[in-house]
């Protein structure tokens, strides 16, 4: 409970708030230095505590506080200006200590987390042993003294916490205690910072735990009469390193009448415990801002020791008066940084009820509204009819099939490259009609059979195909592994492993149309080394089978994850051994191959719309192949594709114009490629870690971007940032990306394998960053803020010269 209280008060904004409290009300604060992370100390009862406040300049005054309460010099706590001493600490001395040093030009703040071990456990242990010695002196094998306190085996704690495991036991002679981690002896040099073992308390203590501390911890207790053991499982939850995120639109502007009640709400998302405060902007001598540009504010509501975050997220104003009108700010901060949103309260006097309009006016209004509604309904019906006709015409002109008299005619386009030799013939409707059974599917029960054309260039006899195990399910069908004979025309007896796409048992007519459409699209696109290629199809005398290349190593995301080096913070599995080492060259090669595949698809006028590591497959020879491109739409005659149906959207991979306007272009695919690059260099990490999807929209509009992965060079990160440019036309083309990655691949071809213990800047040439970042923030390590004067991503504020720097100068 003490640690929870300490984390709750570990905040960046305490210095600002206390400085304002110490000054006269309404006076703007001196600009503060950004405080560092709190320093943590753990002491035993009776030890001496000495803390020192080290300011960068001569200080005029130093103030010490404990849990936000000012300390005074006394017998127990001695204060010597910039030093604080407690000769013998007690458990009640645990808490968050802070020193505030006021200087001529700035204020300096330091925080200290102090934890004093309670001796109660030791007393309990001693009393148990004394009782045992009095009651029994006979030889006895070890037994647990307090088994009820050992029932909780799984302990999930946030990073930086202190963890204690206890295995108190009785026995005669007194048993010995040994600790194991993951079945092996646990030694102090195996952990950064070591650990403490208190034999008399049967306890192991690990301070400031990190993700690499995850695992199974076993206490082995034994004497010459026997042994017992108990295992605790520790899971360290990594914190999401970013400042608080406030929900967009909150608090909202309010309008109230004198005497009524008003509520402002502020929704805060933060992994480190946030500190929330409500402020009201005031005027001093007719001005709302001080000489340094900071606003005059008055604290209305501040978190106390027993105040919950939910209570702090709501500000209630009872019996509103005209003086309550003005600007209110929700200020939230943690150890990483701070955020704020403001709203206005407008107060009116009670308005007397207005006289009701006469009967004639009401009748005219009713007639006008009725006429308007009728016009709207007629217009809507006409537009819907026109849209339906246009959609039907477009559907007939596409590669997709449409049913007419129990036949599915296919119309092929001829504006394709010679690589797709099978599609060079101008489109007749049916080459050679043949019936395709629906297999009695319940969804296709109304249509017992379909007629599909036979394409001799791609047709594969069913007796040459042996289906194997399922590989997965797609949006309208399933994929099976299979062995096919005769795929290689030069070696007709050779057996090849393939993947077969087919419909599920509950498929609809549209599902069949989509599968055929994808097959025809793959025929037209042609073959390329870095895409999944069509090998053939079974369209006659049975269900439709679409035969494509088989990728033995699955998708790129899982391929990277199983090859993470031990100790990487994204994943921990003590029993997992990396399949093979990954080098910088390997990662760049993955990106280069995907870029080549996308360059080819772009040359064929195909937009992927769902480019991500999960949609890139890896062959046995580590060749990257882009999958599901057959679902893309042909855009020979238009420059963009606007999605008009609502479905599951991969929002964390989507460009802003696709998210907000549903416009898909090659440039939106480039944005997705930038996110895929981030996935590659985090070895399968999840984009925007710790950020709720509903907050992603606002953050992207404000120009936030993900930070550089630790295994990524500066040049490659600049490539990602180019892909994430707010203006689509300013993003690179896939042709340019292929050229840049080719150059990078040649420069990194002889580098060593990944070493996560050192910085990877050594792999990057001297690559100057010429990008301007007029509003970048170093306080947010999940995103970096990139916005320029010509980019439509600047935050929108009411016109005031000092808005946007309300609480801290940049």
Curated annotation (Swiss-Prot):
ATP binds at residues 471-477, 501, 549-551, 555, 614, 628. Gene3D superfamilies: Immunoglobulins, Phosphorylase Kinase, domain 1, Transferase(Phosphotransferase) domain 1. Pfam families: I-set (PF07679), Ig_3 (PF13927), PK_Tyr_Ser-Thr (PF07714). CDD domains: PTKc_FGFR1. Residues 385-810 are cytoplasmic. The modification Phosphotyrosine is found at residues 450, 570, 572, 640-641, 717, 753. Its EC number is 2.7.10.1. Residues 28-115, 147-235, 244-346 form the Ig-like C2-type domain. The chain crosses the membrane at residues 364-384. The active site is at 610 (proton acceptor). Disulfide bonds join 53-99, 167-219, 266-330. Residues 465-754 form the Protein kinase domain. This is Fibroblast growth factor receptor 1-A. Residues 27-363 are extracellular. It is a single-pass type I membrane protein. Present in an inactive conformation in the absence of bound ligand. Ligand binding leads to dimerization and activation by sequential autophosphorylation on tyrosine residues. The second and third Ig-like domains directly interact with fibroblast growth factors (FGF) and heparan sulfate proteoglycans. Isoforms lacking the first Ig-like domain have higher affinity for fibroblast growth factors (FGF) and heparan sulfate proteoglycans than isoforms with all three Ig-like domains. Residues 1-26 form the signal peptide. Initially expressed in adaxial mesoderm with transcripts distinctly localized to the anterior portion of each half-somite. Hereupon, also strongly expressed in the otic vesicles, branchial arches and the brain, especially at the midbrain-hindbrain boundary (MHB).
């Amino acid at each position: 409970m003490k640690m929870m209280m300490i984390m709750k008060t570990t905040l960046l904004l305490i210095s600002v708030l206390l400085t304002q409290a110490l000054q006269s009300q309404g006076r703007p604060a001196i600009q503060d230095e950004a405080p560092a992370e709190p320093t943590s100390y753990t002491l035993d009862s009776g030890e001496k505590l000495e803390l020192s406040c080290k300011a960068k300049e001569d200080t005029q005054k130093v103030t010490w506080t404990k849990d936000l309460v000012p300390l005074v010099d006394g017998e127990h706590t001695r204060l010597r200006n910039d030093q604080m001493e407690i000769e013998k600490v007690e458990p009640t001395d645990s808490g968050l200590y802070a020193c505030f040093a006021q200087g001529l030009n700035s204020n300096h703040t330091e925080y200290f987390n102090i934890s004093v071990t309670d001796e109660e456990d030791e007393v309990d242990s001693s009393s148990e042993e004394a009782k045992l010695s009095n009651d029994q002196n006979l030889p006895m094998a070890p037994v647990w003294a307090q088994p009820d306190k050992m029932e909780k085996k799984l302990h999930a704690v946030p990073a930086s916490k202190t963890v204690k495991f206890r295995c108190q036991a009785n026995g005669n002679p007194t048993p010995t205690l040994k600790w194991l981690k993951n079945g092996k002896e646990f030694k102090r040099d195996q952990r950064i910072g070591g650990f403490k073992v208190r034999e008399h308390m049967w306890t192991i203590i690990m301070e400031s735990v990190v993700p690499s501390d995850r695992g199974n911890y076993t206490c082995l207790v034994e004497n010459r009469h026997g042994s017992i053991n108990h295992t605790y499982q520790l899971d360290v939850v990594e914190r999401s390193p970013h400042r608080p995120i406030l929900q967009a639109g909150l608090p909202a502007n309010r309008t109230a009448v004198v005497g009524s009640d008003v509520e402002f709400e502020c929704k805060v998302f933060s992994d480190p415990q946030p500190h929330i405060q409500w402020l009201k902007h005031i005027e001093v001598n007719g001005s709302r801002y001080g000489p340094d540009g900071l606003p005059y504010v008055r604290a209305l509501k501040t978190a106390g020791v027993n105040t919950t975050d939910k209570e702090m997220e709501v500000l209630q104003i009872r019996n509103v008066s005209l003086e309550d009108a003005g600007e209110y700010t929700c200020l939230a901060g943690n150890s990483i940084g701070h955020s704020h949103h403001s709203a206005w309260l407008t107060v009116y006097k009670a308005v007397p009820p207005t006289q009701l309009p006469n009967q004639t006016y009401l009748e005219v209004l009713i007639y006008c509204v009725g006429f308007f509604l009728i016009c709207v309904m007629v217009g809507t019906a006409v537009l819907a009819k026109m849209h339906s006709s246009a959609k039907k015409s477009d559907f007939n002109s596409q590669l997709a099939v449409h049913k007419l008299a129990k036949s599915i005619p296919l119309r092929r386009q001829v504006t394709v490259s010679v690589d797709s030799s099978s599609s060079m013939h101008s489109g007749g409707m049916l080459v050679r009609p043949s019936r395709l059974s629906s297999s009695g599917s319940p969804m296709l029960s109304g249509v017992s059979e379909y007629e599909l054309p036979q394409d001799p260039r791609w047709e594969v006899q069913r007796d040459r195909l042996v289906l194997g195990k399922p590989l997965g399910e797609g949006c309208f069908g399933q994929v099976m592994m299979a062995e096919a004979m005769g795929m290689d025309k030069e070696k007709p007896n050779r057996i090849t492993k393939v993947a077969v796409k087919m419909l599920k048992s509950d498929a609809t007519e549209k599902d069949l149309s989509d599968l055929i459409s994808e097959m025809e699209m793959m025929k037209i696109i042609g073959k390329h080394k870095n895409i999944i290629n069509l090998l053939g199809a079974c369209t006659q005398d049975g269900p439709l089978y679409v035969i494509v290349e088989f990728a033995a190593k699955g998708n790129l995301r899982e391929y990277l994850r199983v090859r993470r080096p031990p100790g990487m913070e994204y994943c921990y599995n003590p029993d997992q051994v990396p399949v093979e080492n990954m080098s910088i060259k390997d990662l760049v090669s993955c990106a280069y191959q995907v870029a080549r595949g996308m360059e080819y698809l772009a040359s064929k006028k195909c937009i992927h719309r769902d480019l991500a590591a999960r949609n890139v497959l890896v062959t046995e020879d580590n060749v990257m192949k882009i999958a599901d491109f057959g679902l893309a739409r042909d855009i020979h005659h238009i420059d963009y594709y606007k999605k008009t149906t609502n479905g599951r959207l991969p929002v964390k991979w989507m460009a802003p114009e696709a998210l907000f306007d549903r416009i898909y272009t090659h440039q939106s695919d480039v944005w997705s490629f930038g996110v895929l690059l981030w996935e590659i260099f985090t070895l399968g990490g999840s984009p925007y870690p710790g950020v709720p999807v509903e907050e992603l929209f606002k953050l992207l509009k404000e120009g936030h971007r993900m930070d550089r992965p630790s295994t990524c060079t500066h040049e490659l990160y600049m490539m990602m940032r180019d892909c994430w440019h707010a203006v689509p036309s300013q993003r690179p083309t896939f042709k340019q990306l292929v050229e840049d990655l080719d150059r990078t691949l040649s420069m990194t071809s002889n580098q060593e394998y990944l070493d996560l213990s050192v910085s990877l800047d050594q792999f990057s040439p001297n690559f100057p960053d010429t990008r301007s970042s007029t509003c970048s923030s170093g306080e947010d390590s999940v995103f970096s803020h990139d916005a320029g004067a010509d980019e439509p991503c600047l935050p929108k504020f009411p016109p005031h010269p000092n808005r946007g720097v309300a609480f801290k100068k940049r």
